[in-house]
Swiss-Prot record:
Annotated protein name in UniProt: Secreted RxLR effector protein 29
Compartments, as annotated in UniProt: Secreted; Host cytoplasm; Host nucleus
Domain of life of the source: Eukaryota
Task performed by this protein: Effector that acts as a broad suppressor of cell death to interrupt plant immunity. Inhibits cell death induced by cell death-inducing proteins, including the PAMP elicitor INF1 from P.infestans.
Keyword Nucleotidyltransferase: no
Induction: Expression is up-regulated at later stages of infection.
Short motif (RxLR-dEER): ranges: 47-64
Keyword Signal attributed: yes
Amino acid sequence: MRRTAFIVLSLVALIAPCVTSVAVEDLAQANNIETNVNPNVKVGSRRHLRSEANGRLAVVDEEKVFRDFCGLGPCFDWLKPQNLGGFIYKFVEWASRDRVNFKLKMLKREHQIPIRKRNQ
């Protein structure tokens, strides 16, 4: 189960950057926003979308748009390719901690007899 989840999340991490740019472009087209209209804004920066509806610069965070669009929340930060190593480490840490906690719970259930102190 966890191996399957790990494989799926790894694939999402590889595909996510492509989907992010496509989702932002689709969002811009749907809201009639032209990209890179303002010459003072650097191409590729986070402030590169201009709203034609009210004529002011819209600050758009591409990653936030993608997170909100897919409902991933802050977990998406671990799925970015540059953080993939950290994500794998966190996943392994989580899996091993979960296994240790499970074993401790089982041991507590097996030995429900209270441990007495020696002097009593």
